[in-house]
Amino acid sequence: MAALAAGISKQRAAAQGLGSNQNAVKYLGQDFETLRKQCLNSGVLFKDPEFPACPSALGYRDLGPGSAETQGIIWKRPTELCSNPQFIVGGATRTDIRQGGLGDCWLLAAIASLTLNEKLLYRVVPRDQSFQKNYAGIFHFQFWQYGEWVEVVIDDRLPTKNGQLLFLHSEEGNEFWSALLEKAYAKLNGSYEALAGGSTIEGFEDFTGGISEFYDLRKPPGNLYYTIQKALRKGSLLGCSIDVSNAAEAEATTRQKLVKGHAYSVTGVEEVDFRGLPEKLIRLRNPWGEVEWTGAWSDSAPEWNYIDPQKKGELDKRAEDGEFWMSFSDFLKQFSRLEICNLSPDSLSSEEIHKWNLVLFNGRWTRGSTAGGCQNYPATYWTNPQFKIHLDEVDEDQEEGTSEPCCTVLLGLMQKNRRRQRRIGQGMLSIGYAVYQIPKELENHTDEHLGRDFFQGRQPSTCSSTYMNLREVSSRVQLPPGQYLVVPSTFEPFKDGDFCLRVFSEKKAQALEIGDAVPGDPHEPHPRDMDGEDEHFWSLSEEFADKDSEISAHQLKRVLNGLLSKRTDMKFDGFNINTCREMISLLDGDGTGSLRPVEFKTLWLKICKYLEIYQEMDHSRAGTIDAHEMRTALKKAGFTLNNQVQQTIATRYACSKLGVDFDGFVACMIRLEILFKLFRLLDKDQNGIVQLSLAEWLCRALV
């Protein structure tokens, strides 16, 4: 219940602008300005109660409490490590980033790339902090997390051994911005150890809010040069590297002076006329050092003598700044992988940059309702969340070789908080997605889930290349104009997890979650429906010997269980007392807490209708129905509910084996009827909004 309320509150705050980089969410409710002011007024240095300087902040296994790796660690403030600590010395550069005893080189590479773009850097590392002015032992940083920017506050106590920083540190002995940034990121993810092992892409995205693509340069797509060209034009961050097959190869230099295992930045592409033929060039930068490529098109290479002198003057950069040109064909031969981080619109201010359009959805896979697994599980696949994208504007600059106009879309499916959950044994799920073209006859279908029949025998237009246990799977797709259904899923069904689905499009795209409405039109029987069997019905129960009497919840339980126990076509252990109280709440017209005969007749007709639906769904006659079948059963009963409500129902009414018995099924139906009835009575303006005082809310909630 608390989680649901928090989720609603979060959605409403986001609608008001909370979560932007200018108005970041306060992580764990900690406000930097308020806390710093309190410390300055009291004359004490900040000690973070949410991420204390203790073993649990270091880790849970290799760096866990009592482990050999943590012996001798002392937490110290920079003011205890040197006489003149500085936040940043002479600007933030790649030399400020030196790896310590933690396997987070992926994070270091991302930070190094961030230093090349000052505007993006200072979104993450606010400049309003130092060890001199207003120093109070407190610092703050901002990270993008699943659709919102989060401000993380830390104290400046850092883990040391023998007087030296244990983890990330600067080449300048008195500079601490990078070590403090690493600590803030560790806090966000639960511990320092949680940062071990990862992809540079993950850091790129958390520092920019962008969406990333990965290309294996051993199997490059034919349009890769064009993709790089467009990415640079959109202000994207591009990185490439040469894979290493073993630890001995790390830092090794090739014959032509390329460093293996290092992240290079891609900074430009150009096509030149070389000896009468077009030659594609690419410009790279090694942010880690001055070692440069010595092959074709390097600074002193003879190829420059065969192009137009004016063009040569524009492109031939002779300064030893780590930046160099090479042919695109050599690039594909020498490098192993390319990563592109496409920036979200709010990251870019220049009007010259062609910005992406962004649509973002947050969702959840819940066992028994929306965790349907991949296409290999047709019985449950259709229950996964479904999202509709409407593409009606084609790209302005169509790619060479494309015969028909198309729309370029970047799809990214990201699972949430799995790094933070490592300490409780929850690793990454294998995730993926499929995209289906929606036929014309279903283009206006938005109010309810597409069912199993839609997917039967239908092939997706495109899908993620494979299901992978990465934080995010993403791909660039080109689709003809039309409407498409995106289905994100885990590989196996019944896996709980939160996710974020992002759609980046070159032109504005309309997108929505299928079945987001919650209409309800339950079956309303009338006592006249039983007139023909009146005497037979009353003879079944001694409780109604006097037809003017009323029955309580305990009497109702005895009557109903007695009636249903006579049936031989169902397995049923009886209604519990709480379900019977819910029944009375629905039909008790005079507020006495009991049912009159006419009300009981209406209830019995409802139960008969529910039983008919239940038995239709109980295919095995086992006395339970699968929780994922509740969506279909609810629809038959008149309720078309969105994913959030379906997930709540599965959590509330399904047992640990994901079955729903008849008592739970009826309790769910009755509860839904009560809630819909209450809302409609209170929604006088019929605008879908009800306002209640606390006392009114409590009275209605306790009904």
Curated annotation (Swiss-Prot):
Query: Record keywords: Calcium included?
Result: yes
| Superkingdom of the source species | Eukaryota
PTM comment: Undergoes autolytic cleavage between Ala-5 and Ala-6 which gives rise to fragments extending from Ala-6 to the C-terminus, Ala-6 to the EF-hand 2 domain and from Ala-6 to the beginning of domain III.
Tell me the active site: C105, H262, N286
What InterPro entries does this protein's entry cite?
Answer: C2_III, Calpain_cysteine_protease, Calpain_domain_III, Calpain_III, Calpain_III_sf, EF-hand-dom_pair, Papain-like_cys_pep_sf, Pept_cys_AS
Subcellular localization, per the record?
Answer: Cytoplasm; Golgi apparatus
What does the entry report regarding how activity is regulated?
Answer: The concentration of calcium for half-maximal activity is 0.3 mM. Inhibited by calpastatin and calpeptin.
For the ligand (Ca(2+) 2), the binding residues are D618, S620, T624, E629
- Domain named EF-hand: which ranges? 531-566, 575-610, 605-640, 670-703
- Cofactor, free-text remark: Binds 2 calcium ions.
EC class: hydrolase
Q: Which reaction does it catalyse?
A: Broad endopeptidase specificity
* Co-factor requirement: Ca(2+)
Q: Where is this region: Linker?
A: 513-531
* Any one cellular-component term (Gene Ontology): Golgi apparatus
Q: What is its EC number?
A: 3.4.22.53
Any one biological process term the GO annotation gives: calcium-dependent self proteolysis
Region Domain IV, as annotated, extends over 532-703
Q: Which residues form a coiled coil?
A: none
Q: How does activity depend on temperature?
A: Optimum temperature is 20 degrees Celsius.
* Family to which this protein belongs: Belongs to the peptidase C2 family.
Q: What is known of its domains?
A: The domain III mediates oligomerization.
Q: What is this protein called?
A: Calpain-8
Give the species.
Mus musculus
